[in-house]
């Protein structure tokens, strides 16, 4: 076990000092002893923390890069779109603790990996579904406080608005990782980011934070918005 220093920087998100000057973040493990993606486990005051790798998590990258508004916190009910194999959802699960995190993934094979890696996390609800068609899982998902989206589709901003109309509480938050190259490989990414921001605003969001997540992900930006729509 390593002696470390931890400091809470957001609710249930910790800055980690290992004495080497490197910037690290971690979450306190909801399933001690269980790794999800080969992450490093470290210990302080008899608590286990999972180092959050920003190279494998866009939310982790945004936090490392100076995210100012972090709406996911203890007690937050979350709808996660694009769960993949569970890397970031597992950290969201740690943060929310005893509150439900609905995790939607489209690909059956990846969903099987997700279930295998996260089956000890009782607050994670895996849903095999298409984020483009929120009505298909509306019988499972209730109203939520936050929607997080990491779906590499040309209409990714529209997908967020669709799901917000179905599930997001008024004045709830959304976080979306926009991948410019999934929308148009011929355009300047900055132009694409402005277009996607406009779609989100016209769809009903007030954008309260935005942060580029390079060098961890090329041509990506994270938007945080408050839902003011219907």
From Swiss-Prot:
Q: What is this protein called?
A: Fibrillarin-like rRNA/tRNA 2'-O-methyltransferase
Q: What is its EC number?
A: 2.1.1.-
Q: Where does S-adenosyl-L-methionine bind?
A: 87-88, 105-106, 130-131, 150-153
- Please report which protein family the annotation says this sequence is part of: Belongs to the methyltransferase superfamily. Fibrillarin family.
Q: Which SMART domains match?
A: Fibrillarin (SM01206)
Which keywords does this Swiss-Prot/TrEMBL entry list?
Methyltransferase, RNA-binding, rRNA processing, Transferase, tRNA processing
| Protein's gene | flpA
Question: Briefly, what is this protein's role?
Answer: Involved in pre-rRNA and tRNA processing. Utilizes the methyl donor S-adenosyl-L-methionine to catalyze the site-specific 2'-hydroxyl methylation of ribose moieties in rRNA and tRNA. Site specificity is provided by a guide RNA that base pairs with the substrate. Methylation occurs at a characteristic distance from the sequence involved in base pairing with the guide RNA.
Q: Which SUPFAM superfamilies match?
A: S-adenosyl-L-methionine-dependent methyltransferases
Note the InterPro entries from the entry: Fibrillarin (IPR000692), Fibrillarin_CS (IPR020813), SAM-dependent_MTases_sf (IPR029063)
User: What does the record give under GO molecular function?
Assistant: histone H2AQ104 methyltransferase activity; RNA binding; rRNA methyltransferase activity
List the Pfam families hit by this protein, alphabetically: Fibrillarin
Q: Alphabetically, which GO biological process terms does the record hold?
A: box C/D sno(s)RNA 3'-end processing; tRNA processing
* Coiled coil regions, renumbered to chain: none
| Record's subunit section | Interacts with nop5. Component of box C/D small ribonucleoprotein (sRNP) particles that contain rpl7ae, FlpA and nop5, plus a guide RNA.
Q: Tell me the organism.
A: Methanococcus vannielii (strain ATCC 35089 / DSM 1224 / JCM 13029 / OCM 148 / SB)
């Amino acid at each position: 076990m390593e002696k470390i220093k931890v400091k809470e920087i957001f609710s249930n998100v910790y800055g980690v000092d290992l004495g080497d000057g490197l910037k690290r973040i971690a979450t306190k493990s909801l399933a001690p002893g269980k790794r999800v993606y080969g992450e490093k486990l470290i210990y302080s005051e008899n608590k286990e923390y999972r180092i959050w790798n920003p190279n494998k998590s866009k939310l982790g990258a945004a936090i490392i890069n100076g995210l100012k508004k972090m709406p996911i916190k203890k007690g937050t009910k979350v709808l996660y779109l694009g769960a993949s194999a569970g890397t970031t959802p597992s950290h969201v699960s740690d943060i929310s603790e005893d509150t439900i995190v609905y995790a939607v993934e489209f690909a059956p094979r990846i969903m099987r990996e997700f279930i295998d890696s996260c089956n000890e996390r009782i607050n994670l609800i895996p849903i095999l579904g298409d984020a483009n068609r929120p009505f298909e899982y509306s019988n499972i998902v209730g109203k939520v406080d936050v929607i997080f989206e990491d779906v590499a589709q040309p209409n990714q901003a529209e997908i967020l608005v669709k799901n917000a109309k179905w599930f997001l509480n008024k004045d709830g938050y959304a976080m979306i990782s926009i991948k410019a190259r999934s929308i148009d490989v011929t355009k300047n990414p900055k132009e694409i980011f402005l277009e996607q921001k406009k779609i989100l605003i016209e769809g009903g969001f007030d954008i309260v934070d935005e942060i580029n997540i390079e060098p961890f992900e090329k041509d990506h930006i994270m938007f945080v918005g408050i839902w003011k729509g219907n």
